[in-house]
């Protein structure tokens, strides 16, 4: 944790076919209300700081920043299949992927993300 980033892992998911993690807010560059590791572009934070925070997390976890795909929560019914053109507008509450490589993410506050996997 030399970079200050902490990622929580569930013992229930360890050893399975998927890598998983739940990053804490430590180790980032954002300031003020969104201080430290803010990963969301939609909450008024400096866009460059969010990009750098995402890059820090990617380096910490060993994946390419371009592989990170996250939901754009709108409390709707749209699902995006990673690799296909983004919907217009690019708003969707679900992600589907049928190939290895992409890192899928979801933001959650009072909403609970539901994660399914089929190796």
Would you name each region that the model predicts?
Residues 1-119:
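Active-site microenvironment for binding and transforming phosphate-containing groups
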